[in-house]
């Protein structure tokens, strides 16, 4: 979508390709995310969010965060809104504080797991949920210059105030501790990889408050190193530390701490599917899982689905994106849902992906059972072999329209026919990066390797050189 030069604030804009993707507006700082463009985003958010209450702004540790937050503040106050800036905080702190304080909404400045050069803007409504597609569309319409109730140029009497409210993060820390009923982790050896990101604001603090024997990696905010060789997308530093220090579990967060992946004491990965199975089994045992239902996405492993069905459970799948998981959970009154990548949503804890909260839940559930994470993982399911390949496809139109590439579509059908009920093919365009994701899953690992290579090569050949 192309946004052309606008002038509701007297600020000229160049053209920029942008829209709300699977997790807000995201792009390269200085290319898409210029101060002028960000100011306009803030202004139109101010037009769309409810009139009553302040608008909260949080951010991760990226070097560009202060610039983005300042430009958003300028746009929001120009729209007459009162702004409370929270400073460095995990993404889930924003919706949690929106609900606690009765705010009109909130914005989180983060590009999640993306590299330091990128940034992004996530927008939450007064209910603490990410904005609906309809409201996102209103903001996009404003950015295109289509009238949606513009209040006119700001004047000396129409501008809203802005306040720094870093102290509000203490409410979020308190909520994290309350989520595990202040259960203790005295002496439990745990490693945390805080990714130089938003988890540094409170991750180590809450685990230490419960008495854990902590080793902390990448534990200071560093906007030039966030997500670089660490965190939930690069688990090797955490794996080395867990094994070398004899920890029984480790947790790695992404840049804004709305998701996490865990490792057991042997360095085995405990992904979002395993978290859903283990936590869901605990809720099931307590008869606290309505309809025995879990909500996951199309990326979740087939081994997980079959094991959950053997427990008498129902697994509902959604498109990729935690907003889809959220919508399905609300509609079906589900207690737990999430993504394989580590976004976990709990109805009892605000229905927002929260990496630190999920890590606390896993740690205390294991400790309460007298088990290490590895011992609990052994009670989980056997995953089908699964491989995900990211094919770089910079051309947005070709990437989003990959289904129209006949050779690639024919190969997908051939793979599905060859693997039958014991395999799956998933090809999807990323909503946040210039990537086409190709995922193959099957009971036969050789088939996984073969078809992953075939489809990735075809995608690279045809989508980047013109589909023929």
Swiss-Prot record:
InterPro entries: A-D-PHexomutase_a/b/a-I, A-D-PHexomutase_a/b/a-I/II/III, A-D-PHexomutase_a/b/a-II, A-D-PHexomutase_a/b/a-III, A-D-PHexomutase_C, A-D-PHexomutase_C_sf, A-D-PHexomutase_CS, Alpha-D-phosphohexomutase_SF. One of its GO terms (molecular function) is phosphomannomutase activity. The modification Phosphoserine is found at residue 112. Keywords: Isomerase, Magnesium, Metal-binding, Phosphoprotein. It is an enzyme of class 5 (isomerase). It catalyses: alpha-D-glucosamine 1-phosphate = D-glucosamine 6-phosphate. One of its GO terms (biological process) is UDP-N-acetylglucosamine biosynthetic process. Activated by phosphorylation. The keyword Manganese does not apply. Its cofactor is Mg(2+). The active site is at 112 (phosphoserine intermediate). It comes from the Bacteria. Its EC number is 5.4.2.10. Coiled coil: none annotated. Gene3D superfamilies: Alpha-D-Glucose-1,6-Bisphosphate, subunit A, domain 3, Alpha-D-phosphohexomutase, C-terminal domain. Catalyzes the conversion of glucosamine-6-phosphate to glucosamine-1-phosphate. Belongs to the phosphohexose mutase family. This is Phosphoglucosamine mutase. The lineage of its organism: Bacteria, Bacillati, Cyanobacteriota, Cyanophyceae, Synechococcales.
């Amino acid at each position: 979508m192309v946004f052309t030069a606008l002038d509701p604030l007297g600020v000229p804009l160049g053209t920029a390709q942008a829209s709300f993707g699977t997790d807000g507006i995201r792009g390269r700082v200085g290319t898409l995310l210029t101060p002028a463009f960000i100011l306009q985003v803030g202004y139109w958010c101010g037009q769309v969010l409810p009139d009553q209450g302040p608008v909260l702004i949080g951010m991760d540790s990226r070097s560009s965060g202060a610039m983005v937050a300042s430009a958003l503040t300028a746009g929001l106050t120009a729209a007459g809104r009162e702004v409370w800036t929270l400073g460095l905080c995990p993404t889930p702190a924003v919706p949690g504080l929106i609900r606690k304080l009765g705010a009109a909404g909130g914005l989180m400045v983060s590009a999640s797991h993306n590299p330091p050069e990128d940034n992004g803007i996530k927008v939450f409504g007064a209910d603490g949920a990410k904005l609906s597609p309809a409201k996102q569309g209103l903001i996009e319409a404003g950015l295109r210059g289509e009238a949606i109730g513009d209040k006119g140029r700001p004047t000396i009497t129409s501008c809203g105030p802005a306040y720094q409210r870093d102290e509000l993060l203490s409410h979020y820390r308190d909520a994290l501790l309350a989520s595990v009923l202040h259960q203790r982790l005295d002496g439990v050896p745990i490693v945390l990889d805080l990714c130089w990101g938003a988890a540094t604001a409170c991750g180590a603090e809450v685990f230490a408050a419960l008495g854990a024997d902590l080793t902390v990696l990448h534990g200071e905010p560093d906007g030039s190193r966030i997500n670089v060789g660490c965190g939930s997308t690069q688990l090797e530093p955490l794996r080395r530390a867990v094994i070398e220090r004899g920890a029984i579990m480790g947790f790695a967060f992404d840049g804004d701490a709305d998701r996490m992946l865990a490792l057991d004491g042997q360095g085995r990965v405990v992904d979002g599917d395993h978290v859903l199975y283990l936590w869901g089994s605990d809720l099931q045992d307590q008869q606290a899982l309505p309809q025995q239902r879990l909500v996951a996405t199309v990326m979740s492993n087939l081994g997980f689905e079959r094991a959950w069905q053997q427990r008498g459970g129902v697994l509902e799948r959604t498109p990729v994106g935690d907003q889809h998981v959220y919508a399905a959970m609300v509609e079906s009154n589900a207690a737990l849902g999430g993504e394989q990548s580590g976004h976990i949503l709990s109805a009892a804890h605000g229905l927002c992906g929260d990496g630190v909260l999920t890590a606390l839940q896993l740690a205390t559930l294991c400790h309460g059972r007298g088990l290490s994470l590895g011992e609990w993982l052994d009670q989980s399911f056997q995953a089908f072999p699964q491989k995900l390949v990211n094919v770089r496809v910079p051309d947005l139109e070709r990437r989003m329209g990959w289904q129209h590439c006949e050779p690639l579509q024919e190969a997908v059908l051939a793979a599905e026919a060859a693997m039958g009920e014991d395999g799956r093919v998933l090809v999807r365009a990323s909503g946040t990066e210039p990537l086409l994701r190709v995922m193959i899953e099957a009971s036969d690992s050789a088939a996984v390797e073969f078809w992953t290579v075939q489809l990735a090569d075809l995608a690279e050949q045809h989508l980047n050189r013109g589909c023929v």
